[in-house]
């Protein structure tokens, strides 16, 4: 109770203000000054605060709308890219399969062409060997024949004398005469 009494005594000693003013010292302000300041702030600040909040709200909403549009556009681009990727993968698979089959076809063609070339080369080699063999045999025959003829001529020349020569001529003339007489 003593505290309450001191409060009233203390209020009685306050001097009266000569003019109206705002006390800027927060610890020394009274309830009326605080109410006036808060009321003025609410009255004048309400419109400004509302405008600021509305502007902020509009910016946030437009940012959200832009983000949604960008998201939709990005999703569309992503879907187009996925479709394009699938198409490219299908084409790549097709090219790969065609490439493999083309490689196999070319490999078979190359093997066939090489086989044919080898067969032709083998045939040509065999023909060449046959002709060379025939030529060599003909040369050997010719050489043997020449040597035989030379040997026979040598033998005849060494064995023939004039008397044998005349007898041979007479025998041949006799044979020719017999042939003529029969006609």
Swiss-Prot record:
Keywords assigned: ATP synthesis, ATP-binding, CF(0), Chloroplast, Hydrogen ion transport, Ion transport, Membrane, Nucleotide-binding, Plastid, Thylakoid, Transmembrane, Transmembrane helix, Transport
Q: What's the name of the protein?
A: ATP synthase subunit b, chloroplastic
What topology does it adopt in the membrane? Single-pass membrane protein
What the entry lists under CDD domains is as follows:
ATP-synt_Fo_b
Q: Which GO terms describe its molecular function?
A: ATP binding; proton-transporting ATP synthase activity, rotational mechanism
The entry's localization annotation reads:
Plastid, Chloroplast thylakoid membrane
Tell me which family the UniProt entry assigns to this protein.
Belongs to the ATPase B chain family.
**Subunit (UniProt):** F-type ATPases have 2 components, F(1) - the catalytic core - and F(0) - the membrane proton channel. F(1) has five subunits: alpha(3), beta(3), gamma(1), delta(1), epsilon(1). F(0) has four main subunits: a(1), b(1), b'(1) and c(10-14). The alpha and beta chains form an alternating ring which encloses part of the gamma chain. F(1) is attached to F(0) by a central stalk formed by the gamma and epsilon chains, while a peripheral stalk is formed by the delta, b and b' chains.
Which InterPro entries does the UniProt entry name for this protein?
Answer: ATP_synth_b/b'su_bac/chlpt
Q: Which organism is it from?
A: Saccharum hybrid (Sugarcane)
Q: In the UniProt entry for this protein, what further remark is given in the free-text comments?
A: In plastids the F-type ATPase is also known as CF(1)CF(0).
Q: Where are the transmembrane segments?
A: 25-45
Report the function annotation for this chain.
F(1)F(0) ATP synthase produces ATP from ADP in the presence of a proton or sodium gradient. F-type ATPases consist of two structural domains, F(1) containing the extramembraneous catalytic core and F(0) containing the membrane proton channel, linked together by a central stalk and a peripheral stalk. During catalysis, ATP synthesis in the catalytic domain of F(1) is coupled via a rotary mechanism of the central stalk subunits to proton translocation.
In the UniProt record, which is one GO cellular component term? chloroplast thylakoid membrane
